[in-house]
Amino acid sequence: MSDLRTAIERATPRRKRWPWVAAAVAVLLVAGGGFALTRGDASTGRSATAGAPVRGGTLQFALIDYQRSPDPQWGTNYAESLIGNNITDKLTWQDPDTGEITPWLAESWEYNKDLTEFTFHLRKDVTFSDGSPFDSEVVKANFDQYVHGDEKLGINPNGAILLPGYIETLTPDRYTAVVRFEKPLASFLQASSFTANAQPGFLSLSTLKLSAEERTDPKKVIGTGPFVYESWQPQVKTVLVRRKGYNWAPPALKHKGEAYLDRIVFNTIPEASVRTGSLTSGAIDATLDVGTTDEKPLADQGFKIIYRGVSGTSIFFNLNSQLFPTDDIAVRRAIQLGWNREAVRKTVLTDSYSVATSVLAPSVPGYVDYSGTVLRYDPEKAGRLLDEAGWKEGPDGIRVKDGKKLVVKLLGISNLVANKPAYESIQQDLKKIGIDLRLTVVPIPDYTALLTKAKTDWNIVAANRSRNDPAVLNLQYGPALGNGSYVTKDSPGIDVDEVTRTLGALELTLDPATRKQYAKAAQDLLLDKYALVNPVYNPSQVIAHADYVHGIIFDAQSRNHFVDTWKSNGK
């Protein structure tokens, strides 16, 4: 066992030592009331800095989860997208405050009026860490494989949902790439900056020729980013080292040259108390996934708490429109109205989080607040709706209709620290109006396995989707895309063509005013007309770090970048 692992275990002598080869499982704790913390500058998407940056040193950083593959285009969790963002770059950078798309590997771009053709003019000084050039042929090869996959190599079409209707990438010259779609895709510019799961980070031509199995060797996964892989130990740690010669960070970051840190060690530490103990003992320098009950104690001890709300959707309940009893709109509306959001805010969430007031996060353009209407707490109306729909109270308080109990089965992930306590609070409230909400909240690998039967086994799939664009609603709920509520022509009382048309309109224009109207129509349809989703809370990525750590960046998807990170002691 490494010296760091030994130090981590010593930091928590009263707890059973964690088997480091076990799957990542979060300890989920109910938090106390809200409080104010001394924080970094979350509004600008980076931690506070002090003085001139110091070069050198190793950042020991803890995560609840681990990389299942070094391939960033495959990633399915936060750990994978975070690490992928630091070995690869994107065509564009999205400003985390304004949402503006700004240059990165592409210096400029233009698009046709139909939003089916996007032309990018590339930087000419970018190289991969193996010395090979970044050019239009690389862009073409990446997008082709990202969208279509490669069956012979075992590569999945990871970008097929993000880039629907992709036709091809043309290469009129070495540094011009023209990306074409069969229908309008207004959200593509934002997608070109996308940094969350299954991201379009550029890989070298040599990497693209490798099979999925061969890509488990991190040394063979080559990007253009500010760091390169040194090693990868699944469920234990991933180590990155500084890329020599890097000099093309997004201009918006105003960072020149190479990263400051020599090395980053991403340590998988599933248990919240062990992450906290490791930080307070000095075994690590920073940790993501701070437990809700740990924020205030860490702040009181002088650690900096920085956070950013996740742009995209809230943590939501997808309500299955095909499966009894959520095929009944009265049940779906009762679930929306039947739980106390203020109680969740007070007993579960900290100031780093907020109760959801729409399916969209407040940071997404076009967000509308529904807290005074369909997302208010109104158990009396919820009860009346169920009464009118024929749901009668049974002897145990759970409602019954046609001899069947009002049992609603929920599948969710445990890897976000506020999930399970929030769901348990909702469970208690819904029971008061006669709904038996049964929870299955498990780590991501188990969740993914159970998700294969979501349409037939689960009334609710609790999830969220990161993307700072209102088209995330089409991505998540479009019947031909994510179809999170399983809307088909067989869904009772739902016009599937209307759903397709309303959500698809978000891809038709980049005009802000028109897009705002389309976003409202989409939210009205999902939340009010058909009650297909029950938003719960707006998640945040929360980091606690020592006061000698500076310059951790949150991007528009609330993923972290370390090109500008440094340690005062340089160690």
Where is each model-derived feature located?
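Aromatic- and charge-enriched surface segment that lines or borders ligand/interaction sites
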Residues: 108-153, 174-178, 325-327
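Detector for C-terminal structural segments
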Residues: 2-3, 29, 233-237, 339-369, ...
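Extracellular/periplasmic solute-recognition and catalytic clefts
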Residues: 146-156, 169, 230-241, 265-323, ...
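Gly/Pro-rich hinge or "lid" segments in bacterial periplasmic/extracellular proteins
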Residues: 195-259, 263-265, 273, 379-380, ...
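N-terminal lobe/hinge region of extracytoplasmic solute-binding protein
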Residues: 62-113, 144, 222
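Ligand-site clamp/hinge motif
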Residues: 215-218, 246-297, 424, 436-438, ...
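Surface-exposed binding/hinge segments that line
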Residues: 121, 157-208, 228-233
